[in-house]
Regions:
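A short, mixed-charge helix-start or loop-turn motif at secondary-structure junctions
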Residues: 13, 37, 108-109
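Cofactor-binding active-site loop characterized by glycine-rich and histidine/acidic residues
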Residues: 41-164
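Asp/Glu-centered strand-loop micro-motifs enriched in Gly/Pro and often flanked by an aromatic residue
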Residues: 33-42
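Cofactor-/ligand-binding subdomain signature composed of acidic, glycine-rich
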Residues: 1-34
């Protein structure tokens, strides 16, 4: 299995398109395995597998920052950042992995612990402002679903991001 060997998104960089598809298939199976035994959010995670593989292939995490809204779609991200055992292993392995993004679990890859909708864009603008103050150039990627995009805080974040004008 590819996903058992992936310790960081950098491990995806040398894979062919066919191999990336296999990684996506294995990630989907791992998400289903965890959710069937442990519970969790199946739909948003399954719907975001290919996008997560693509994001981690294109961007350079952990230098580039991913900010998940609600974290209902973060399981594929966890699989691709060295935490596949929490989706493939025994129940004790699954219990060690949070159902949400968790800096306590992975400070390198999980920037915030969230559980409320519509927050990712605002949080990303905070990272954007910090990046600009430091004078660094990493990408900040806000990941938000259609249900969360209708929240007031998402609109506030979009407004602030446009005011800052330096890109998220």
């Amino acid at each position: 299995m590819y996903i058992e060997k992936i310790q960081s998104p950098a491990d995806l960089k040398g894979l062919s398109l066919a191999e990336l598809k296999t990684v996506a298939d294995e990630t989907r199976a791992a998400v289903l395995n965890r959710v069937s035994k442990h519970g969790g959010h199946v739909g948003p995670n399954l719907g975001f597998v290919e996008a997560t593989v693509a994001l981690h292939y294109v961007f350079d995490a952990p230098k580039d920052k991913f900010v998940f809204d609600v974290s209902h779609q973060c399981y594929p991200h966890k699989v691709l950042t060295g935490r596949a055992s929490g989706f493939l292993g025994e129940m004790s392995d699954m219990n060690a992995i949070s159902g949400y993004s968790s800096p306590a679990e992975s400070p390198e890859y999980d920037n915030f612990e969230v559980g409320h909708t519509s927050t990712s864009i605002s949080l990303a603008t905070g990272l954007q402002k910090a990046r600009d103050i430091k004078g660094t150039h990493e990408n900040i990627i806000a990941i938000i679903g259609d249900g969360s995009l209708s929240g007031g805080e998402a609109f506030e974040g979009l407004d602030e991001a446009s005011e800052l004008g330096t890109g998220i």
